[in-house]
Regions:
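Active-site helix of classical SDR
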Residues: 121, 156, 164
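Residue(s) in the substrate-gating loop at a strand-loop-helix junction
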Residues: 139
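Conserved glycine-rich cofactor-binding loop
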Residues: 12-13
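Alpha-helical segment proximal to the catalytic Tyr-Lys
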Residues: 126, 169-173, 234
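Substrate-binding pocket helix/loop in short-chain dehydrogenase/reductase
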Residues: 97-98, 105-110, 202, 206
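Conserved glycine-rich Rossmann-like NAD(P)H-binding loop of the short-chain dehydrogenase/reductase
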Residues: 28-43
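Short C-terminal tail/terminal secondary-structure segment
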Residues: 144, 226, 237-253
Length: 253
């Protein structure tokens, strides 16, 4: 039996990188997309996957461009001859108060964080057979909570669960499942960016409101995504699963 193949966008760091390593440990080959302007070295993901005993091909990708996304899926087929899973993880995060919001900032955010998910799933589905699985990474910012000075980000992330629910129904006759993951506060390079996100101090402060007493790790989100693409979740589709250490169910003090 041929090993399965997963396509991951935003695989150079954070959740995407952790997922690539998790897949490697379970024998799944990885085709990862990375944004060329991203400061993180994509070779680091390749090295970690190889250390875990897996195979990974990292290719440049702009999820804001349909041709780029289509090319990634086609290259996955050329390299491995099949595509079983697709995880839309790539995302943009920038702080922008409403009164400073420009149409360009708004459009860029939705183009990457929402339309980019659609592009990824559209490209992957063209090559998937029955038993395929799609997972999109949303956020509690928009998916559950609001977030001041990030209305464009929250709007995009709020749209992801709706997209996944609709695609779950549409793609079910093809034997393809589609789910969303809604992470809470997870320590990643993106969340550690104090200019556009919480930063180290903000994360430490926020952790005090989390019932489990800490922020999450990228590998913990990766484990959930891996479950959602596995046969262990074969009857699960159209769902949006929050992974936040209990933050969104805590009663106010």
């Amino acid at each position: 039996m041929k090993r399965k193949v997963a396509l991951i966008t935003g695989a150079a760091s954070g959740i995407g990188q952790a997922l690539a390593v998790a897949y490697a440990r379970s024998g799944v080959a990885v085709v990862g997309g990375y944004y060329p302007a991203d400061p993180h070295d994509p070779q680091a993901t390749v090295s970690q996957v190889q250390e875990a005993g897996g195979e990974c091909v990292m290719l440049p990708l702009d999820v804001g461009n349909s041709a780029s996304v289509d090319a990634l899926a086609e290259q996955a087929m050329q390299h491995f001859g099949r595509l079983d899973y697709a995880v839309a993880n790539a995302g943009l995060l920038r702080r922008a108060p409403l009164l400073e919001m420009t149409d360009a900032l708004w459009d860029e955010m939705l183009n990457v964080d929402l339309t980019g998910v659609m592009r990824t799933f559209r490209a992957a589905t063209r090559h998937m057979n029955e038993g395929g699985a799609l997972v999109a990474i949303s956020s509690i910012a928009g998916g559950v909570y609001g977030w001041q000075e990030h209305s464009h980000y929250a709007a995009a992330k709020a749209g992801v669960p709706g997209l996944c629910r609709s695609l779950a129904v549409e793609l079910a006759p093809l034997g393809i499942r589609c789910n969303a993951v809604i992470p809470g506060l997870i320590e990643t390079p993106q969340s550690l960016d104090a200019q556009n996100s919480l930063g180290p101090e903000g994360l430490a402060k926020a952790a005090r409101a989390i019932p489990l007493g800490r922020v999450g790790r990228a590998d913990e989100v990766a484990s959930l995504v891996q479950f959602l693409t596995s046969d262990a979740s074969s009857y699960l589709t159209g769902q949006s699963i929050v992974i936040d250490g209990g933050l969104t169910v805590r009663w106010p003090d």
